[in-house]
Amino acid sequence: MVNMKASMFLTFAGLVLLFVVCYASESEEKEFPKEMLSSIFAVDNDFKQEERDCAGYMRECKEKLCCSGYVCSSRWKWCVLPAPWRR
């Protein structure tokens, strides 16, 4: 019985210690997730889409016309694939 109490106490103490370490590292590095996400999703100038006269799939079509093969959704104002119910 004593052995089980000791193991439960050690488990609980380990969880508390893990929580304290995680909280301390999070409070030190609050900007780390933002920096990591911005570096992952950073877009290089070579990979940027070129500006077109028409809007492609799932692009806004308020001011631009949709490219061939797409229609402007009256509800969402996006360029979508034409379907029988969108006539």
From Swiss-Prot:
Residues cleaved off as propeptide: 25-52
Highest taxon listed in the record's lineage: Eukaryota
Subcellular location: Secreted
Pfam families hit by this protein: Toxin_12
Effect of loss of the gene: The natural mutant mHwTx-III does not reversibly paralyze cockroaches.
Disulfide bond positions: 54-67, 61-72, 66-79
Tissue-specific expression: Expressed by the venom gland.
Signal peptide residues on this chain, from the entry's feature table: 1-24
Domain notes: The presence of a 'disulfide through disulfide knot' structurally defines this protein as a knottin.
UniProt name for this protein: Mu-theraphotoxin-Hs1a
Naturally occurring in which organism (per UniProt): Cyriopagopus schmidti (Chinese bird spider)
Lineage of the organism: Eukaryota, Metazoa, Ecdysozoa, Arthropoda, Chelicerata
